[in-house]
């Protein structure tokens, strides 16, 4: 779903024990022989180095830190693929990065299910505004779905080939609702 090829250059800044660090891009890139660069996250270094790469995965906290640097104002991200997830991704962050020219994928996944299970790719601000105009309560998870889903007792249940549970339903404990356009929104998480 992220268009990674053997010619891709992956910039991994998420911790490797984190699904966004290892599973979302790094391991798939390794498997196909793409170039991988792994380093500890630093917002200033990110802005200096990002244009040497084709793909990266950030968390919303990374995105906010990057957007607060002085370098972000003049940063050109044209053609770069940025996947963002691990925590809910708000419209402000999506807009900031898409306005910089990148392809921005809002992503939801879990280690148990697969790192890229539900997502939406934004290539221009018009698409962001269209999705935002159709938003419901919560934050967007996506509308491209790579597993079977059902919402039962308000929580998202998943199964499928990308899940470690295969054909058994797994309760994610995420409180999820779909709008009339089948866009998934996370509205919270059960704590018990």
Task: Give the residues covered by each predicted segment.
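Short, well-ordered beta-strand segments
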Residues: 9-12, 156-157
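Alpha-helix capping/helix-boundary segments
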Residues: 43, 62-63, 89
């Amino acid at each position: 779903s992220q268009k990674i090829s053997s010619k891709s250059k992956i910039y991994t800044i998420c911790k490797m024990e984190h699904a966004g660090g290892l599973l979302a891009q790094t391991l798939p890139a390794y498997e196909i022989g793409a170039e991988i660069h792994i380093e500890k996250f630093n917002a200033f270094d990110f802005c200096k180095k990002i244009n040497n790469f084709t793909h990266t995965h950030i968390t919303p906290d990374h995105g906010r830190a990057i957007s607060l640097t002085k370098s972000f104002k003049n940063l050109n991200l044209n053609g770069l693929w940025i996947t963002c997830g691990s925590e809910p991704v708000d419209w402000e962050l999506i807009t900031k990065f898409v306005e910089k020219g990148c392809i921005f994928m809002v992503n939801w996944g879990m280690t148990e299910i697969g790192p890229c299970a539900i997502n939406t790719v934004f290539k221009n601000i018009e698409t962001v505004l269209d999705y935002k105009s159709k938003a419901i309560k919560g934050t967007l998870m996506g509308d491209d779905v790579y597993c079977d889903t059902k919402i039962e007792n308000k929580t998202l249940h998943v199964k499928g080939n990308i899940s470690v549970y295969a054909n058994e339903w797994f309760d994610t404990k995420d409180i999820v609702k779909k709008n009339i356009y089948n866009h998934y929104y996370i509205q919270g998480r059960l704590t018990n």
